[in-house]
């Protein structure tokens, strides 16, 4: 039972992240706590080492991100700051073979028992699929949730290329081929064809340098 006179609700959310992939080190390097400031940027704790952070800003959502899947807590009302911690499981621990990181978020939310909806949340438990995550913007009228930022697409120019060219082409190929593995193969061939003029020019330049090497 929640008392009627409390001004806010304290929330403690934690997860011991289970191993899902064969490549242990690569999975660890792609797992972290992500969070989005209200009407602001998406930030994350270190993916490669233990990290902790405390913020007083309003937060729209917080996520425990794994290599291919994420669990996300989206607040209808903003979370009032958060204390976050992520640390790898010790290699000598009995849990190391099945788990790879401990993650914890402590936060709070304004609460009024007299409101029609005193504390509403949306919880996403699913794959890091760009278009699927982006589709959740429809559940928030006030701002772009930016859940698609959970998908790592590289820096600046590479992110633009991946967002507007590579992902749409891949989704189209998946629909046509009906098989993701075949779609990846076809996309790889297409990229090699597109990049062939640049790579061929590089090979020719290297060959010329090898011919000149004895003279130099």
Give names to the regions the model predicted.
Residues 55-59, 179, 195:
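Residue-level detector of functional hotspots within protein domains
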């Amino acid at each position: 039972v929640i008392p009627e006179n409390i001004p806010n609700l304290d929330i403690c959310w934690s997860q011991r992240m289970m191993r899902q992939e064969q490549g242990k080190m690569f999975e660890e390097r792609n797992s972290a706590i992500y969070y989005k400031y209200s009407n602001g940027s998406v930030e994350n704790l270190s993916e490669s080492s233990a990290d902790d952070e405390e913020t007083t800003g309003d937060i729209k959502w917080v996520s425990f991100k794994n290599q291919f899947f994420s669990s996300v807590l989206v607040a209808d009302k903003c979370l009032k700051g958060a204390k976050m911690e992520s640390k790898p499981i010790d290699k000598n621990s009995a849990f190391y073979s099945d788990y790879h990181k401990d993650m914890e978020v402590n936060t709070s939310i304004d609460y009024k028992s007299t409101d029609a909806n005193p504390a509403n949340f949306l919880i996403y438990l699913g794959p890091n699929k760009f278009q699927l995550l982006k589709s959740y913007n429809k559940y928030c009228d006030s701002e772009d949730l930016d859940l698609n930022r959970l998908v790592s697409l590289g820096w600046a120019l590479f992110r633009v290329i991946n967002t507007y060219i590579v992902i749409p082409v891949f989704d189209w190929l998946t629909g046509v081929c009906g098989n993701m593995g075949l779609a990846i193969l076809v996309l790889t061939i297409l990229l090699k064809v597109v990049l062939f003029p640049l790579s061929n020019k590089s090979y020719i330049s290297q060959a010329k340098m090898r011919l000149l090497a004895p003279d130099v």
